[in-house]
Each structure stands twice: as structure tokens, then as C-alpha cells.
Amino acid sequence: MATRGGAGVAMAVWSLLSARAVTAFLLLFLPRFLQAQTFSFPFQQPEKCDNNQYFDISALSCVPCGANQRQDARGTSCVCLPGFQMISNNGGPAIICKKCPENMKGVTEDGWNCISCPSDLTAEGKCHCPIGHILVERDINGTLLSQATCELCDGNENSFMVVNALGDRCVRCEPTFVNTSRSCACSEPNILTGGLCFSSTGNFPLRRISAARYGEVGMSLTSEWFAKYLQSSAAACWVYANLTSCQALGNMCVMNMNSYDFATFDACGLFQFIFENTAGLSTVHSISFWRQNLPWLFYGDQLGLAPQVLSSTSLPTNFSFKGENQNTKLKFVAASYDIRGNFLKWQTLEGGVLQLCPDTETRLNAAYSFGTTYQQNCEIPISKILIDFPTPIFYDVYLEYTDENQHQYILAVPVLNLNLQHNKIFVNQDSNSGKWLLTRRIFLVDAVSGRENDLGTQPRVIRVATQISLSVHLVPNTINGNIYPPLITIAYSDIDIKDANSQSVKVSFSVTYEMDHGEAHVQTDIALGVLGGLAVLASLLKTAGWKRRIGSPMIDLQTVVKFLVYYAGDLANVFFIITVGTGLYWLIFFKAQKSVSVLLPMPIQEERFVTYVGCAFALKALQFLHKLISQITIDVFFIDWERPKGKVLKAVEGEGGVRSATVPVSIWRTYFVANEWNEIQTVRKINSLFQVLTVLFFLEVVGFKNLALMDSSSSLSRNPPSYIAPYSCILRYAVSAALWLAIGIIQVVFFAVFYERFIEDKIRQFVDLCSMSNISVFLLSHKCFGYYIHGRSVHGHADTNMEEMNMNLKREAENLCSQRGLVPNTDGQTFEIAISNQMRQHYDRIHETLIRKNGPARLLSSSASTFEQSIKAYHMMNKFLGSFIDHVHKEMDYFIKDKLLLERILGMEFMEPMEKSIFYNDEGYSFSSVLYYGNEATLLIFDLLFFCVVDLACQNFILASFLTYLQQEIFRYIRNTVGQKNLASKTLVDQRFLI
């Protein structure tokens, strides 16, 4: 290997500087330099260097060659021009050339001497021989011939020739042999290592160099590669500033996870020693961490340095999803090196350079589409890894960009190696970024350093990059899509090779996008606090209204429980509003933005949102069950206004005679009204099956589910061969909720505007049926509050034939009879009622007798059967409620009034029915609140939340649709069945007639 020019002068300067002085200098001035410098520089490639320039593999830029020199074949060094011989060569461009005399225009193959050629010269100015001839330039002992002949190689001074590996020519021996021993032999006390010869003194401090390869617990071993090449690479880098050796030393440090321990002199320890003792050399591109001749491996080891690197300088490139200036491509490039430190090439990361999992090129390249969250996981056989990666390739990753003057630059991409140990501590696994040590160079697979004793055998251990994550952080408050330098987080795993054909390893590659969501969290907390406070007030008002409706002024345990139930419902609405609002915000602003200003929360940040959705569902379920229980326990009674039409003769059993009796009133009208009431108990303003199927159609068939993908596209369709990004829980919830609400609201509007008006309105039809049947409905949803449907026929009776019925309808249509309202000359048939305690007590006394048919027989009169007692109680209740409506009981009278607007808004009554009950005119059919019909908002939101919770848990819209419809039918069945039993119990209608 060769040496760098001026090495002797550099070593003289370095010897004057102590390690402590250098360290103090760095600690004093490095923070100031860091604040002033940037980590970007011009992007240059080897093929763009001029013929008289070479590509400096350390500085990654084109550097001029010396006099009488040109670029070599690889472009990374210099050679003499044709007709010039080398008189000095220490590696790289540091060579000296001298023109050959006229009588010896040819140059030897090694370029060190001039020679007379027996025939023509090649383009390189060397002798040319016919096919089948061997060019011999020196005699057998190495003496240069005036004309090419075959001679023995001469290893003495002035020749220093040895036989090459192929044995077909004599070549000059390795320069370190000449410099160290002035011969081609490396005899004691000199040290022969890695094919190089070094002096036994003056290279490194007298400390034992460790060839240990650090790994996971219990996986450390002595690497044959380190044992063979570590010392030689370090010595060549230190003594001769050899660029390739310095790169090879850096590679060994990277293979050792960039870990170093002050107690040992391992690969990174040697690198740090050279770095600290070359402080007198200039930096590369004004980057203080990048020393001339050395690779850039570290960002320094000062606490708090990592956050500055990651957030001090933003990329001037603007990223946008849409518009004329659309820019959604992250242009990553990498300088690649082989294990021996040779520069291979510049290459883009497209095509799966850093992705071990195989896939199509389109899907692999999707990882670098800005705004697309990327996840790739697979399991790879160890045997395939050993075949595909016999030696590691090392990458220095950069992000390419163009400034405002259209000049190309590259920005260094820092690396967070989770396996890095600093003094045996995994500092990069700490949650505090201030303790991180950022690095630069990475590799994917190392199957070399894990070989023991022989490099030709199968490795005992291989090291694989099992987790690679590229995170892009958006600059806060940006409106132009500016980002900070991306961060590569990488984790390696050591695999102990036992049977390569049966072993495998799981690997993953991901790209995530982050932004500071602190402000969003604060705003969410503020909204939750404000709306939660309003929910408390609303719940207090509902509780106060409930207390009035049950006629109890005392605050007891039941009151507290009721308040908590009301608060659960209101708080569910708060969580629902916040989650839907948050979801729609991210859906609209992320998918519709042009210049990028917001990025989606990461999955771990979505946990809080999912918790809110879960709370909304749990609380809404409690509210739904509370309403369900309230509906199936209401008091209801059908008041039959029909009166007997006359008397008939009736035989008296046991007396052998007859007597006159009133004509009994038919019960069929009551049964009919009861059946209609039973049918409308679960009538809704939407069609549940249509709702579920329509939502599913838009999600799965139309493709609205694609809006929930974590990418920048707002298209409803995706190309199957292309990469499909993972779903965002927030976007998935937002799309589902928006569709469910939109379709539900459309159904409700259609139901109210068209269906009820032109086709069928079951609620109003029920009120009309009551009038035609001459039956009123008395409902008590609370102890002292309920509803009254006035169904008293304006014709006096309803138990008639078809002809008379049609005649009555005709008279009513022609306004030839009075109006149906409770108050004369009005149409008001529905009322909200607040009854007095005295009225309720009287009702309860009769009702207690009515329900005694379910009690023990010993409590009943011995002279009457249970059935007769119930019939008697039924007629008593019918008579009492009829007389109450007719103002017969002055001590239990009532008056009719309109509700105040504020009373309607607050849902409570300001007046207490102390002596008289109060009937409030109700044109809105409020009695539907004891039915499904009047609670559509609660049912719609409950179904929506159920659908979303199932989907978030299973990530399956089809399953969520099926389970949602199933629960709707289950609760509908429960409501029908239990409500029917309650109706039969409270009205004495035999359940067998409720069909």
C-alpha cells in the first residue's frame, strides 16, 4: 500500500500536540463551529472529474493531479503521462514523474523506469510484445535491462523486485518493505501484518490491540479479519495517511457497531486515536467531524449534540403533494465502499439498495415517495443471505437537493445505531435524544467479521440489519414543506450459524413521517376541557329536570347515579365530536394540501385518539342501555271512550231467569291500537340494512377506504402492482364516520321531507288511528311526567259498521263536526303532561290492583278470582283516567298551556304541578321519545361508534358491517320482546293478541 504526500511533515506537527490539548481545543470551540456550519456540500461524481483530476474518496470531490500526471483507470488516483517515469509514489496523487530519455522512450510495466522497447509502444507508453510473448524488462536478479529480456527478479537496493502472484513478471515489492527494511523482506524486529511491513516502534502507543468483535450478550468472538487486517490498516492510515487503509479501518469500526471503550484498543479505539491525533489537519467541506484522509463516522460524543444535528438545519427543498410544483421524491444517494476500503460508486437508494426484502422495483421505490408511510417485513433464509452477501458493502447516505441556483448539493443523513455501545452502555436506546451518539456509515450484512481462524470457512456468526427505519421530520410551522435532515435508525442482530439451510431471520424496513403534534394535543385538551365542562352543566340541567319529573326534591344516591348516567351520555357526545372533528381535520388537511404543512400522527401517537374513540363508544353504550331500559319500563294505558249503546236481556247463571244488562263494549279496538303501538316501538328514521350496505358499498366498491391510506394520494383507486401504504386509524375512523353520518343524515332528511309526507308517517298515523278507534293513550315515562295522546272520537263512538264509519270520515273531511283536539275548536291531540303527586298516588293505587294478577293469590279477595279483580281494576283505571281528562275530579284537575321556548330548549319544566296537573301543547309528537323513533341521534351515533370500534380492532370493514347489523337486530329483538311484555302487563292486553 502507498503513503500520502507530506506524511513526514504532518507527523512532525502531530507530535507537538498532546491528546489533552486537542481535546480541550475541541471542547472549547466545537460548539461554536457547530452553530456556524452546515452539513452539506457540492455533489460530485468520479465520471465528471476532468482528465487531469482524480476523485478523492475521502473528500468525495474532484482534486487536481500533479505535474505530468493524469487520472488513472478507476478515476480515484493519478498516474504519470506516457513517456514519464515515476520516481516517487506514496499513494493517491502524491507521485513524482520524470520524463524518459529519447533513447529509452518506453516505460516499464510498473512505471518506475524507462526502457528501450524491442517493438512498438502502447498508448500508455509501455513496451508491446506480439501475442504469445512475455515481456521481460529486467534480468533474473532484477537489474533493469536496456532492452526487454527475461531475467531473475533483483530484490537488492535500487531494484527491489519480487515475483508477482502469477509468476509471469518481476514487480517492485510493497513500498512499506522498502521504507522499513530497505529490502523486500520484513525481518525482525519489524512487524509483518496484513501484507505490510511496519517498524516495531513509533506506530501506536504500547497498548494491546484488540481483535474482538462485539455483539449481543454472549456473542463476542475473536475475528480473523480483525486479527489479520486491523493493525495493518490502522498503521497504514496513521503512518502513511493511506486513504484506502483509513477507509478499511473505518469499515472495521462500523462492523464493530461504532462501539468503543476507553479501556480497550479496538477498531473504533484506533480510529479515535488517529482522529484525535490528526487535529492539525484540515477538515473536509468545513465539517468539524470529517477529518482529512479519514472517513466521516461520528458526529461527536458530546451530550446534547444529537438534537442540534437533527433540528438545527432544514433542507431548502420544498415538498408538495399537488400543483405545478409537485415534489414528492426523496432523492437519496450513497457513497459505497467495499470491505477493503475501496470506493465503489455513487448510487441511488432506489431499487432496494437498503431493503433486504425482495419485491418489485415499483414497490421498493415507493419507500422514497414523500408522505407515504412505508412498511416492509419478511423472513429471509440464512442460506440466501450468505450467497447474496459474501462480503459487506458500506454506505454513506446523503440526501440530494438543488438550491435556488440549480446547483446540486448533498446533505449528510445521520444514523442512529441502536447497537452502539459507549463504554459498554447502549446510549442510543435511551429515550432522551440528548444522550444519543449519531454516526454515518452503515452496512446490511456482515458475513466476514464473524469468521474465526480461517477467512475461507463459513462464519460462526453473521450480523444482519434486521430493522431499518427512515424517519423524516417536518419543520414546525412550515407552509412550504421543509424538512430537517432525515434520520436512519438501524438495529442489527447476530445470528449464530448452526444450520444455514434451516435458519431464517426476520427483517423490516420502514419510512415514517413525523411532525410536532404538541400544539394539536393542547388544542384537543382545551376542547375536551371546555366541552366536558358544558357536558357537566347539561347533565346537571337534565338531572334537575328529571328530579322535577319524578316529583322529588331530595338529592339522594339515585340522583347521583342518574347524574352520572346523563353525564356519560353527554361526555360520549363530547368524545364523539372531538374524534370526528380531529379525524376530519387530518383527512382534509393532509389529503388536500399542496405544499406540505401537516403530516399524519404516527401509529404510537394514534393510541390517544383510539382511546378517545373507545371512551365515546363505552359511554354511548351506557346511554343507549339507559334509554332502552327506560323505554321498556314505561307506564302505558289505553283509555277507551266508547260507551255501551243500550241494554240486552241476559240469562243469569244459577238463578234460572233473565235480566237486562248493558251491551258490552268491544275490546278489539283496544287490541288493534295496542298492536299498532307495539309495531311502532322500534320504527326508525333510517333503514338499518340500507345504511350498513350503502356504507360498505362506498368503502369497499367505490374505494373510499383508500382515502385512509397513509400516503399523499387522494385517489379512490389504487393500482394493484403498486405499493399499498398501511392504513391510518385516524383516517380510517374519519372516512367511516363521515360516510356513516352523511348517509344517515340523507336518510333522515329523505324520511322527513319525502317519505313521511308522501308515503307513510307511522307516528301521525298512530295518532289518527287513536281518533278513529276512540281510544286515548296515557303514557308516563317518569313518576310525574309523561305524554297524552287524545284519541276521543269527535263522532261519539267508533264501534260501528263500515257505512257509518265512512260517513263519519266524510263529515270530518267536510268540517261538519267538531275538531279532534282536547280543547274545543283545536286540533291539538298530543301533549306533554306533568301530573301532581296526588294524581300519581291515585293512579298507583288503581295500578297496584291492576297488576295483582302477578302477585300471590292469598292477597286477593276470597270472593273474586284474580282475573275478575284485574278486569275490575282495568275498568276502574279506564273510568278514572277518562274522568280525569273530563275535569271531573276538581282536587286532581289540570290546565293546558304552551311550553316556553327556554323550556323546550332546556328540556325541563319551570312550573311544578303542585295542586293541578299541567298539560303542555305538543305539536312535535314528543311522545316518540319513548320509542326508537325519537332517539334516532343516539341510535345513529351508537351504531357508528360500534362500527368504527370493530373496524379499528379488526381492520375489516366487511366484518364491522356484519357485526353492526347483527347488534342492531339483537337490540331490536330485545326492545320488541321486552317492550311487548311491558305493554301486556301495563294495559291488561293479552300478549297472545300482540302479533
UniProtKB/Swiss-Prot annotation:
<keyword id="KW-0225">Disease variant</keyword>
<keyword id="KW-0979">Joubert syndrome</keyword>
<feature type="intramembrane region" description="Helical; Name=6A">
    <location>
        <begin position="927"/>
        <end position="929"/>
    </location>
</feature>
<feature type="transmembrane region" description="Discontinuously helical; Name=5">
    <location>
        <begin position="732"/>
        <end position="771"/>
    </location>
</feature>
<feature type="disulfide bond">
    <location>
        <begin position="237"/>
        <end position="246"/>
    </location>
</feature>
<comment type="function">
    <text>Required for ciliary structure and function. Part of the tectonic-like complex which is required for tissue-specific ciliogenesis and may regulate ciliary membrane composition. Involved in centrosome migration to the apical cell surface during early ciliogenesis. Involved in the regulation of cilia length and appropriate number through the control of centrosome duplication. Is a key regulator of stereociliary bundle orientation. Required for epithelial cell branching morphology. Essential for endoplasmic reticulum-associated degradation (ERAD) of surfactant protein C (SFTPC).</text>
</comment>
<feature type="glycosylation site" description="N-linked (GlcNAc...) asparagine">
    <location>
        <position position="318"/>
    </location>
</feature>
<keyword id="KW-0550">Obesity</keyword>
<feature type="transmembrane region" description="Helical; Name=1">
    <location>
        <begin position="520"/>
        <end position="548"/>
    </location>
</feature>
<feature type="intramembrane region">
    <location>
        <begin position="930"/>
        <end position="936"/>
    </location>
</feature>
<feature type="intramembrane region" description="Helical; Name=6B">
    <location>
        <begin position="937"/>
        <end position="952"/>
    </location>
</feature>
<feature type="disulfide bond">
    <location>
        <begin position="173"/>
        <end position="184"/>
    </location>
</feature>
<feature type="coiled-coil region">
    <location>
        <begin position="828"/>
        <end position="917"/>
    </location>
</feature>
<feature type="glycosylation site" description="N-linked (GlcNAc...) asparagine">
    <location>
        <position position="242"/>
    </location>
</feature>
<dbReference type="GO" id="GO:0060170">
    <property type="term" value="C:ciliary membrane"/>
</dbReference>
<feature type="intramembrane region" description="Helical; Name=4A">
    <location>
        <begin position="671"/>
        <end position="679"/>
    </location>
</feature>
<feature type="glycosylation site" description="N-linked (GlcNAc...) asparagine">
    <location>
        <position position="141"/>
    </location>
</feature>
<dbReference type="GO" id="GO:0010826">
    <property type="term" value="P:negative regulation of centrosome duplication"/>
</dbReference>
<dbReference type="GO" id="GO:0060271">
    <property type="term" value="P:cilium assembly"/>
</dbReference>
<keyword id="KW-1003">Cell membrane</keyword>
<feature type="topological domain" description="Extracellular">
    <location>
        <begin position="953"/>
        <end position="957"/>
    </location>
</feature>
<feature type="intramembrane region" description="Helical; Name=5A">
    <location>
        <begin position="732"/>
        <end position="757"/>
    </location>
</feature>
<feature type="transmembrane region" description="Helical; Name=2">
    <location>
        <begin position="559"/>
        <end position="590"/>
    </location>
</feature>
<feature type="disulfide bond">
    <location>
        <begin position="253"/>
        <end position="268"/>
    </location>
</feature>
<feature type="transmembrane region" description="Helical; Name=7">
    <location>
        <begin position="958"/>
        <end position="985"/>
    </location>
</feature>
<keyword id="KW-0206">Cytoskeleton</keyword>
<dbReference type="GO" id="GO:0035567">
    <property type="term" value="P:non-canonical Wnt signaling pathway"/>
</dbReference>
<feature type="intramembrane region">
    <location>
        <begin position="680"/>
        <end position="688"/>
    </location>
</feature>
<dbReference type="InterPro" id="IPR019170">
    <property type="entry name" value="Meckelin"/>
</dbReference>
<dbReference type="GO" id="GO:0051082">
    <property type="term" value="F:unfolded protein binding"/>
</dbReference>
<feature type="topological domain" description="Cytoplasmic">
    <location>
        <begin position="986"/>
        <end position="995"/>
    </location>
</feature>
<keyword id="KW-0981">Meckel syndrome</keyword>
<keyword id="KW-1186">Ciliopathy</keyword>
<feature type="glycosylation site" description="N-linked (GlcNAc...) asparagine">
    <location>
        <position position="179"/>
    </location>
</feature>
<keyword id="KW-0209">Deafness</keyword>
<protein>
    <recommendedName>
        <fullName>Meckelin</fullName>
    </recommendedName>
</protein>
<keyword id="KW-0970">Cilium biogenesis/degradation</keyword>
<keyword id="KW-0472">Membrane</keyword>
<dbReference type="GO" id="GO:0036038">
    <property type="term" value="C:MKS complex"/>
</dbReference>
<feature type="disulfide bond">
    <location>
        <begin position="153"/>
        <end position="170"/>
    </location>
</feature>
<feature type="topological domain" description="Extracellular">
    <location>
        <begin position="37"/>
        <end position="519"/>
    </location>
</feature>
<keyword id="KW-0732">Signal</keyword>
